[in-house]
UniProtKB/Swiss-Prot annotation:
Residue positions where Phosphoserine is found in the record: S320
Name under which the protein is recorded: Serine/threonine-protein kinase 24
Tissue expression pattern: Isoform A is ubiquitous. Isoform B is expressed in brain with high expression in hippocampus and cerebral cortex.
Enzyme class: transferase
Pfam families per UniProt: PDCD10_N, Pkinase
Species of the source: Homo sapiens
A GO cellular component annotation in the UniProt record: nucleus
Active site (catalytic residues): D156 (proton acceptor)
Domain Protein kinase: 36-286
Protein modification: Proteolytically processed by caspases during apoptosis. Proteolytic cleavage results in kinase activation, nuclear translocation of the truncated form (MST3/N) and the induction of apoptosis.
Transferase listed as a keyword: yes
Catalytic activity: L-seryl-[protein] + ATP = O-phospho-L-seryl-[protein] + ADP + H(+); L-threonyl-[protein] + ATP = O-phospho-L-threonyl-[protein] + ADP + H(+)
Self-association state and partner proteins as the record states: Monomer. Interacts with CTTNBP2NL. Interacts with RIPOR1 (via C-terminus); this interaction occurs in a PDCD10-dependent and Rho-independent manner. Interacts with PDCD10; this interaction is required for the association of STK24 with RIPOR1. Part of the core of STRIPAK complexes composed of PP2A catalytic and scaffolding subunits, the striatins (PP2A regulatory subunits), the striatin-associated proteins MOB4, STRIP1 and STRIP2, PDCD10 and members of the STE20 kinases, such as STK24 and STK26.
Length: 443
């Protein structure tokens, strides 16, 4: 067996005795190809491809996420985290997890099949009305109320991570960066999420709690109303500076006062002033506008008609390549702002989640980790210290220097190793510049 598969089996065996599994279990011996019939590909989830499937024992339709551990070596901890959180959840508002199976280097994760698409998909044919927005937000709030009561934080709430069944049921999905709080650890301070939806305190890496999900919900409310989050036209790195520094986004346009007030309540820069999910369920926008979830089937039908027309117009397009788990999706990649920043070095997670000490150190050597750039300590930090010293001496602007330094470190968080690449490219360009006589023309 491949070393990565061995590592996976070791970690799960270590954990299995302590983990509660309301929704499923992990089986390292059964052959998933005998237990399940894999049908058409329906999307791309976090870490792997998602297929529609049949449980041969019950004839139940399921979603099968298949991950090649050889190709997902950098994401093993995140995959384990997603399974850990899902296996601990038992709520009609959270995607159900039925079990995991390991076959050679392929991990099969069996989940609830949700054929209605994601909330992001439903935006593709056109805008939603406020009744539809309120109904979706109410169901997200029910999911968040459940998670927060279990001391869990989703940390990546956005329309792409909200899935619907064909009957209009709304469920939270994609728990690859979800966090667990305990009685002794009431806040977290790791930098994860998707930039446009991230709360200011998360970006600043301050201590944060479930109120970070409420901020993301407010951004999602704007996304559902306008089709995209605020600042979606900007580079994500720029947005990471704007969110903590600027006033909170507001919902502009021809929307009702209650919806605008709902968004404003969620997007308070001070986390303690944001309402809880339970309190937001009583907000007048929700109470006045939300209907039964069956009302959303009209949206799902609209999306399916739109998708069929798109396929007919462009038969060469591969509409099955979506980005969420278990959805019958139409490839709703609305731009570069969808990506999620995942935790690089998970802290000691509680309640049976993987601890660093649980892993065989020798086997861990088989999984190369992308290191942070060496130039951060050898070049970048000393350089900025020198710049700040010189700037102070002549009364310069220290804030701009700190912003530039922060941008480099945020880029490194998102893409470890990028600073070394940048410095190497700069050196090459400087060498070419000097060889060409300082860039002056010879004619």
């Amino acid at each position: 067996m491949d070393s990565r598969a061995q590592l996976w089996g070791l970690a799960l065996n270590k954990r299995r005795a302590t983990l509660p599994h309301p929704g499923g279990s992990t089986n390292l011996k059964a052959d998933p190809e005998e237990l399940f019939t894999k049908l058409e590909k329906i999307g791309k989830g976090s870490f792997g491809e998602v297929f529609k499937g049949i449980d041969n024992r019950t004839q139940k339709v399921v979603a099968i996420k298949i991950i090649d551990l050889e190709e997902a070596e950098d994401e093993i901890e995140d995959i384990q985290q997603e399974i850990t959180v899902l296996s601990q959840c038992d709520s009609p508002y959270v995607t159900k997890y039925y079990g995991s199976y390991l076959k050679d280097t392929k991990l099969w994760i069996i989940m609830e099949y949700l054929g209605g698409g994601s909330a992001l998909d439903l935006l593709e044919p056109g805008p939603l009305d406020e009744t539809q927005i309120a109904t979706i937000l109410r169901e997200i709030l029910k999911g968040l109320d459940y998670l927060h009561s279990e001391k869990k934080i989703h940390r990546d709430i956005k329309a792409a991570n909200v899935l619907l069944s064909e009957h209009g049921e709304v469920k939270l999905a994609d728990f690859g960066v979800a966090g667990q709080l305990t009685d002794t650890q009431i806040k977290r301070n790791t930098f994860v999420g998707t930039p446009f939806w991230m709360a200011p305190e998360v970006i600043k890496q301050s201590a944060y709690d479930s109120k970070a999900d409420i901020w993301s919900l407010g951004i999602t409310a704007i996304e559902l109303a306008r089709g995209e989050p605020p600042h979606s036209e900007l580079h994500p790195m720029k947005v990471l500076f704007l969110i903590p520094k600027n006033n909170p986004p507001t919902l502009e346009g021809n929307y009702s006062k209650p919806l605008k007030e709902f968004v404003e309540a969620c997007l308070n820069k001070e986390p303690s002033f944001r309402p809880t999910a339970k309190e937001l369920l009583k907000h007048k926008f929700i109470l006045r506008n939300a209907k039964k979830t069956s009302y959303l089937t009209e949206l799902i039908d609209r999306y399916k008609r739109w998708k069929a027309e798109q396929s007919h117009d462009d038969s060469s397009s591969e509409d099955s390549d979506a980005e969420t788990d278990g959805q019958a999706s139409g490839g709703s990649d609305s731009g570069d702002w969808i990506f999620t920043i995942r935790e690089k070095d998970p802290k000691n997670l509680e309640n049976g989640a993987l601890q660093p000490s649980d892993l065989d150190r020798n086997k861990m050597k088989d999984i190369p980790k992308r290191p942070f750039s060496q130039c951060l300590s050898t070049i970048i930090s000393p350089l900025f210290a020198e710049l700040k010293e010189k700037s102070q001496a002549c009364g310069g602007n220290l804030g701009s220097i700190e912003e530039l330094r922060g941008a480099i470190y945020l880029a490194e968080e998102a893409c470890p190793g990028i600073s070394d690449t940048m410095v190497a490219q700069l050196v090459q360009r400087l060498q070419r510049y000097s060889l060409s006589g300082g860039g002056t023309s010879s004619h």
